Amino acid sequence: MFDGFSNNKGKRRSFFRFGSESKNNDSEKSVRKPSVPSTIKKSTNIARTSTAETSAPDIPPRSPNRNAHSRSHSIQAPLQKETLKNTNPFLNAEDTLGDSLELTQSKEASGNDHKGIEYLQENNIIGQRTNPFTTSANSNAHFSKIKRSRPPPPPMDMKSITTSISNNTTKEEIESNNDSERDSIAISSTHNQHRRQRSEAEKLVDDIENYINEHKVSSGSSLSLDTSENSDTKASQDKLPVDVMEAPILRNVSAESSLSYVKPLIVDNEEVNKASNGNLVQSDHLKEFSSNLDDGDDKFSFSTSASGKSTKSLQQVSKDESSGFKAAHFDFAYKSNEHLGSDGSIASARKPLRITNEIDSGSSNEDDDDGLQEKGFVDSESKAFINYASDQGSSIKNDVSTQEPELPSHRRIFRVVNEDRPSFYLNSVNDTGSLTDKHSFDTASSGEYDAKSNFSSQSGLSISKGSKSTVLAALDSNGNTKSSNKTSELNSLNSISESLVPAAHSFNEHTVTIPATVDLPNPVHDAPSERSVKCSPLTSVVSNKSEKSVPLVSSYVEELRLKYYKTSNFLQAPPNLPVALKQKNNLIQPKNIKVKLRTSSKQIGIKHGKVKQKLLALETRNEESDGTATGLKNKINVDHTKEFHKLLGKENETGSISKKEGTDAEQAEDYLKDIPGDEAYNSDDIMAPLREKRGQNGSVDSVSRSNTVVSYYTRSQNRMRSGTLDNDYVNRQKLPTHISLQDYRDANARSNISRQDSVSTTNSDVVDLSYSLGHGLRVANPDSDPE
């Protein structure tokens, strides 16, 4: 019974200790078994002593307290163990190489020691069958510490991967390749790890991205922005510009969304002044531009409005008597001088320029002489002149060869923000520096928007290289915009005029020559010009409401309200607007509600509290005082104040006097006109008695609220201070208003007694105790009980 209990206890002890404890139990069992031959016992003892020496050499093999030693060894074992098996594939390549070298060295060192042990292990199978825990773990104890669950992953060199990518690939393709590599690595590494479940928000975001991509693919087919049609006519095929590589490309964002990246228009002076290295424009290039307007180079993005209506989605229709209704908007893109080859992602991201109320930059042949007098940079003070050279008989090739427009050397990205009025004008009607004549504005306002007719009547405007610097200097004198944007604006305007080269049979070339001493006029027009008034019905947003005069709030007031009141309902005006704007520009104008009060006998004595305020607020102005109505003559207007003075006998004896003497009676009763508190009864304003009248501000005799109220500063200065060390505040004199500052300083110097230097004199008046001995010590806080 006791033997069985001790055996079970020993088995249980060997269950928790896998190492040397299981060997002890096996040795005890082998001693108790009489059927085991002596040869096998010797071999097992030899093998166990050798393994005990290799695994735990500090424990003697035959010590009586062997279990205690093994228990203490098992407690201290975690301090000597190796680190946990790390399966992170993103370890450094150096660490993984070092670990693999150490592993091979330890295997080579331990392989020599275990050659004899493996030979004895083959003969030891019969003795180890009795205990299931004494498998090959004891013999391979040194191997179990070093052996990993799987070999470390091969080192990855990301630099060699990124350098192997060709130069013509975009950043989008590089990021997609890197993401696919990371995803494959993450899938293989998280085989035995927990996977984070995707939330509903992430699934919704993915669904939205898929929808945006599908919408982008479907809308991209409608936009004819394919650059492969005219690739054979290009003389040079440039690489991808640097601006596209520098721009952060947002994936899964549609090209029409407001989140798409737009590079700011910041151009250095060097890029403006240097000659562009573009190719010469051929004559077939001009014909090709008029035929195919869909090739785009410059990137235009439109800001999305808060109401959801965009300028791109609007198709304004203008009425023309001759040609009927025509669309006021038409899309075309600028000609590309940089080919991207087979890059389809950037070609699909190009935006067409939408020009509303397109204006001819030149005049027709009939109005050439009239346009000379009206257009151009003309200044009366500087007496600038314009050389207008038009050769009617010359062909297009001669015009192109004499002066050819410069193609832009870099890709421009524009941001159209003013979506309500997308037509922009350089100057106004009063400005003589306009580049267009009246005929172009008349055609623009009448609504004739035919692409072929416009381009046939157009004439290219190009500025020579010599005059570009003068235009830059002239624009620098203009103070409307910042200096950083002036060069970029001129560059964009110049490139627009150069790239919009029309195909026409009669090609007229205008060369504007500006002297170096000419300063451009700089008028600042706050009022809307005639130009914007003409084109306003074309550029106004389409609305299904009736077009009657509604006193709506202006956009300036709405901006101010949004600025000052973040949660504004557009019904309250900002605080710093004038009163006229506050009263006349509100959507809901309050009207005076006329209420006739039936005062009962209970309400007569009420002269205080909230009931009086309600009575004052409900009373309206005295309508009988106008005197315009005819039926007011028979009505008796009772003045209770005058009756009260008559009752007290304060009225003058000359009550009924003639009109000549009426002025004296009015002067005698002037005090009745300004009764304090009477404004509350004659107006709708309850707070009228507290407000000062305009006439009383300058009067000295009248006592008003501002005269009687003492400010906090003067009150704190005049208060009597007790318990402070600063007792000189009594001697401080107030600064009067009728004397000068020097008199104040002299009076202050007389009041302050200061110690003077000793003077050697025989005069007895000088010797004074206060001067010789000083004031002495005085107690600042004397005790209340004098001793």
Swiss-Prot record:
Cellular component GO terms, alphabetically? cytoplasm
Subcellular location, principal: cytoplasm
On whether Hydrolase is a keyword of this UniProt record, the answer is no
Q: Which residues carry this modification: N-acetylmethionine?
A: M1
- What are the Basic and acidic residues biased-composition ranges? 170-184
- Keywords in alphabetical order: Acetylation, Cytoplasm, Phosphoprotein
Q: List localization entries.
A: Cytoplasm
Highest taxon of the lineage: Eukaryota
Residues recorded with modification Phosphoserine = S63, S254, S313, S342, S345, S390, S477, S492, S546, S683, S699
- Could you tell me where the Polar residues compositional bias lies? 36-54, 130-142
| Stretch list, region Disordered | 1-115, 130-200, 217-238
Where composition is biased (Low complexity), the residues are 160-169, 218-230
Q: What else is on record for this protein? A: Present with 155 molecules/cell in log phase SD medium.
Q: What is the official name of this protein in its record?
A: Uncharacterized protein YDR239C
Q: Name the species this protein comes from.
A: Saccharomyces cerevisiae (strain ATCC 204508 / S288c) (Baker's yeast)
